[in-house]
Curated annotation (Swiss-Prot):
Its EC number is 2.7.9.3. The gene is selD. The keyword Lipid metabolism does not apply. Its cofactor is Mg(2+). Mg(2+) binds at residues 51, 91, 227. This is Selenide, water dikinase. It catalyses: hydrogenselenide + ATP + H2O = selenophosphate + AMP + phosphate + 2 H(+). CDD domains: SelD.
Amino acid sequence: MLDAPVRLTDLAHGGGCGCKLAPSVLQQLLANQPQAAPYAQLLVGTETGDDAAVWQIDEERCVIATTDFFMPMVDDPRDFGRIAAANALSDIYAMGGTPIMALAILGMPLGKLPIETVRAILAGGASICAEASIPVAGGHSIDSPEPIYGLAVVGLCAVSDIRRNSGARPGDALILTKGIGVGVYSAAFKKQALSNAAYEEMMASTTLLNRVGHKLAKDDDVHAMTDVTGFGLLGHGVELARGGGVALDIDFARIPFLKEAQELAEAGLITGASGRNWASYGDAVVLPAETPDWRRALLTDPQTSGGLLIACAPERAEAIRGTIEAAGFPRATIIGAVAAGEPAVRIG
């Protein structure tokens, strides 16, 4: 963790995927928007709140497009760029694709930040794109009151490999590939209450590319995928349940958490986005009686560059989990199962 002359987080009112508009607000904004005639080539659009748009270009191939940007959740400019780039790339992997190029999205308060700081943000993002073997082929920049950085990413995918958030089937096992708690860690960081060890753990998690999703999509026993980001495990779980018309049964005791997440949440170091996520999705969630507020906050904790939530055939679940672990995801865990029923997430 580097000391920065200006704390990037002091220049932003929010950070990471906790900056996302509340789902309920987003629904209001998108309601009654003019709709173009249906496009046969648009295989995935806005209908199920999936991770990216997918456009079929011929019988076998499609293009995947996504964009993600946010304000800083850390002060080290290079680390900010790395997290933002990994987060943007994740949507391509979650759909089963592989990225081919990115465009940078940059808004900076140039009167408050030196050029060297902004250059370091861009360098951090470029380093992650280099790790993903893609170029940053251009972009757009503005002078803005708060620092903003992210990417628009284009990827390719075989039509047969597309993995939506709407394919979960009753009986499927649920696998989560990364630990939960990035939002809690970022809240603690903002208040200078995060240990150096926890910071390093957060950086390792948020900069770990989800490219295993591309490999998993070639397995016919993997039925649905989504990445867990700003709406938290519950929010993205509800989207998966609604997309497939199923219920998700998740065992709280099996959920992998970052090492200090539960302690920090119990101490009240949670984000405002956690409450907004509950307000938007809580009506589709069943919690045990007497669930403490801190547990609920962890379940709705906004993740930045979070893990993949995967629904797969139960008889292959352990083998698939092992494949994920071997790809560099030591926290990959089977956390529950898919059941028939009204779309909901049920926590046990």
